[in-house]
From Swiss-Prot:
It comes from Bos taurus. Its cofactor is FAD. One of its GO terms (biological process) is pyruvate metabolic process. The modification Phosphoserine is found at residues 285, 297. Tyrosine phosphorylated. Homodimer. Part of the multimeric pyruvate dehydrogenase complex that contains multiple copies of pyruvate dehydrogenase (subunits PDHA (PDHA1 or PDHA2) and PDHB, E1), dihydrolipoamide acetyltransferase (DLAT, E2) and lipoamide dehydrogenase (DLD, E3). These subunits are bound to an inner core composed of about 48 DLAT and 12 PDHX molecules (by non covalent bonds). The 2-oxoglutarate dehydrogenase complex is composed of OGDH (2-oxoglutarate dehydrogenase; E1), DLST (dihydrolipoamide succinyltransferase; E2), DLD (dihydrolipoamide dehydrogenase; E3) and the assembly factor KGD4. Lipoamide dehydrogenase is a component of the glycine cleavage system as well as an E3 component of three alpha-ketoacid dehydrogenase complexes (pyruvate-, alpha-ketoglutarate-, and branched-chain amino acid-dehydrogenase complex). The 2-oxoglutarate dehydrogenase complex is mainly active in the mitochondrion. A fraction of the 2-oxoglutarate dehydrogenase complex also localizes in the nucleus and is required for lysine succinylation of histones: associates with KAT2A on chromatin and provides succinyl-CoA to histone succinyltransferase KAT2A. Signal peptide: none annotated. It is an enzyme of class 1 (oxidoreductase). Disulfide bonds join 80-85. The gene is DLD. NCBIfam families: lipoamide_DH. This is Dihydrolipoyl dehydrogenase, mitochondrial.
Amino acid sequence: MQSWSRVYCSLVKRGHFSRISHGLQGVSVVPLRTYADQPIDADVTVIGSGPGGYVAAIKAAQLGFKTVCVEKNETLGGTCLNVGCIPSKALLNNSHFYHLAHGKDFASRGIEMSEVRLNLEKMMEQKSNAVKALTGGIAHLFKQNKVVHVNGYGKITGKNQVTATKADGSTQVIDTKNILIATGSEVTPFPGITIDEDTIVSSTGALSLKKVPEKLVVIGAGVIGVELGSVWQRLGADVTAVEFLGHVGGVGIDMEISKNFQRILQKQGFKFKLNTKVTGATKKSDGKIDVSIEAASGGKAEVITCDVLLVCIGRRPFTQNLGLEELGIELDTRGRIPVNTRFQTKIPNIYAIGDVVAGPMLAHKAEDEGIICVEGMAGGAVHIDYNCVPSVIYTHPEVAWVGKSEEQLKEEGIEYKVGKFPFAANSRAKTNADTDGMVKILGQKSTDRVLGAHILGPGAGEMVNEAALALEYGASCEDIARVCHAHPTLSEAFREANLAASFGKSINF
C-alpha cells in the first residue's frame, strides 16, 4: 500500500486526480495542488505586464530571446492600462468636452445647444472600451512576437526559476536564464483610513464612481489628485484638495508654473487647502464622511464633510511575495529593489525596472528601462538620462516639464537664464480661444544649452517631447530658435520662448 500511496501522491501533484471517491484504504489523504506537466524553458522571464514589463518582453523576443511574461491579473497592461493612465485620460478628455458644452464656452463660439445632459454610464463605457482595445492589443502583440503569456502570480523560486501560481491553485514552473522584475507599484495606504472603493476610494475607485458626488475631498494635490479632482469637478462635483505641501502639482514642478496652474484651476472652481494635513476620516450614519484637517505645522482643527473621499498620497513599490528575501535581495528604505546601472540586482541574472526601482514612477520611464535592460542582456549598451524623462499633468490646461526647474538650478548653484512666452500671444491659441498658460525655458548662461523646459497650456504634453529631444542631444536655446516651426501652431510658443532665452527677446511678445 505504501507504493500505491506514492503513485497517488504523484498523480495528484500532476493534476491527474482531484480526489478518489471514498479514498483508498491505507492511503493517507494529501492536499490538492496541481502542477503543469512540464516546466517551460525560457531565456528571459518577465514578471509583470505593465508598460515596463510588456515592452521589455516584446523587445526581448525581437532580439531573439525565448521570452515568457507572467501576469497575475486576467488582463495585460498593469495599472497603467487597466486602472491608471489610460482610463483616467479617457475621463479627463470626455469630462473636458462636457465642461465646454455645459458651460459658456460653446455659446461663445456660436454653438448653441438647448440641453446638455450627462450620461455617466455611457462615459464609463467609452473608457472601458478604450481599455479593452489596448489590453487586447498587447495580447495580440505577444502572439505576433511569440511571447509566451502565463497568467498567474509570479514568484522567484530560484535564481533560474519562476513559479506562477494560477487562480485555481495550480502552478507553472519556468526554468529561465534571466529574470526581469517589472511588478510596478500599488496605492500607498493612508494610516487610519480604510479604503472601501465605494465612498472612500483610491484612484482605482475614483475611475468608476456610479454617480457624480455632490462634494468630493481629495487627499493630495499631486498629479493624480488634480487630474481625478478635475474630472469630477468638471462633471459637477464641489471638489476640495487637501495638500500637505505648499504648492500643487507634486514633486519636480517649477514653482512659478505651479502658482499659475493653481490660479487657473481655482478659476475653474477647484478648491485647495495647502500646507494642511488630514488627521482622520469618519463615516457618519447618513453615509457622508467627516474629514478632519489642520495646519501642517499644527493648529486649529477643522472638519470638511463630503460624499466621497479620494486618497491620493502616492504609490509604493509592489514587491511582496516575489521571493526576494529567500534570495537575499534586500530592499532599500523606501521599499525599492537596489540595482546597478545595468538594472541588475545583487544576483546578476535577476533584473528589475520601473516603479520597483529608484526614479520617478512613470510609465514611459519604465518602458525605456525595459527596452534598455533587455538590450543590455543581449550585450548592448545601457544608458538612460533621467534628466530627459518628461512629466505631464493631463488637466486642462496641461502641465509638462523636462529637465531642471529654477529651484533645482538655484540649489545646484548653476547660472542660468530664462525665456518665457505666453500663449495669449500665440496665434493658434488665440484662434482656439484657449490662451491660459505659458512656455518657460531655462538655459545655461555660459553655453546657452537648454537645461529645462516648463509648459503650462494647451498641448503641453505633446510639446514637451520637443524639449526632451533637445535635452537628450544637448541642444542650445539658439538651436531651437533657429528651427522653422509651422504656422500657426501652438509649438511656435516653444520656439519663441527659446528666442527669448537665447537673444533676450521674442518676436511676438
